[in-house]
């Protein structure tokens, strides 16, 4: 085997030679075995261990080289997260300026929007409540048709006919029904107008039941005389 030929045994030191061997000479030499069966295996195993150590160190260097960019990326991401999670007082001057400018813009836009809203509201309701009520009254006064719907009034007439007729129910023509409806509307409008005069006399605007009751009492007293 080639290992047997390459391996050399260390010579025995003589009694006359008192010089100590060098470290380099003893590092690659195995001690003298007792039975003489060592074929330089220690030398070969030491070489193998050295090679293994070199391989491990090389792989560690490569792993370290690969881990460095990953560590940098993680550190940069961590710094970004820290910047995002920081309290607003610890921000940079540039970010402070940006936030101040944005706040000033929103504050300036707030009063303008409020003014626009108020203007729109004023333009939408320029007429007061009293004027709107007077306009509605004039519109109803100039209305040519009947104010009470025809179908509800006909039901009311039928109810009174059934209630006060003893024998067979009466029949009403369309013209008679229209005349009754117009006369009823005239009576109601005149009575409400008289009642509203009492409301104005009491310096009020809303018509109440007591005003209509007082006007009915006055009308009844006038009929007796």
Curated annotation (Swiss-Prot):
Keyword line: Centromere, Chromosome, DNA-binding, Kinetochore, Nucleosome core, Nucleus, Phosphoprotein
CC terms in the record's Gene Ontology section: CENP-A containing nucleosome; chromosome, centromeric region; condensed chromosome, centromeric region; inner kinetochore; kinetochore; nucleosome; nucleus
Regions that span the bilayer: none
Biased composition (Polar residues): 43-52, 86-103
Chief localization: nucleus
Modified residues annotated as Phosphoserine in this record: 74-75, 77
One of the protein's GO biological processes: kinetochore organization
Region of interest: H3-like: 133-225
Region (Disordered): 1-131
Sample GO molecular function, one term: structural constituent of chromatin
Source domain of life: Eukaryota
Presence of keyword Nucleus: yes
Biased composition (Basic residues): 1-11
Residues the record lists as Phosphothreonine modifications: 76
InterPro entries per record: Histone-fold, Histone_H2A/H2B/H3, Histone_H3/CENP-A
SMART domains named among the record's database cross-references: H3
UniProt-annotated location(s): Nucleus; Chromosome, Centromere, Kinetochore
Pfam family of the protein (one): Histone
SUBUNIT field: Forms a nucleosome-like histone octamer containing two molecules each of H2A, H2B, cid and H4 assembled in one cid-H4 heterotetramer and two H2A-H2B heterodimers. The cid-H4 heterotetramer is more compact and structurally more rigid than corresponding H3-H4 heterotetramers. Interacts with the condensin subunit Cap-G. Interacts with Chrac-14.
Function: Histone H3-like variant which exclusively replaces conventional H3 in the nucleosome core of centromeric chromatin at the inner plate of the kinetochore. Required for recruitment and assembly of kinetochore proteins, mitotic progression and chromosome segregation. May serve as an epigenetic mark that propagates centromere identity through replication and cell division.
PANTHER family for this protein: HISTONE H3.2 (PTHR45810)
Protein family according to the UniProt entry: Belongs to the histone H3 family.
Protein name per its UniProtKB record: Histone H3-like centromeric protein cid
Native species: Drosophila melanogaster (Fruit fly)
Gene name of the encoded protein: cid
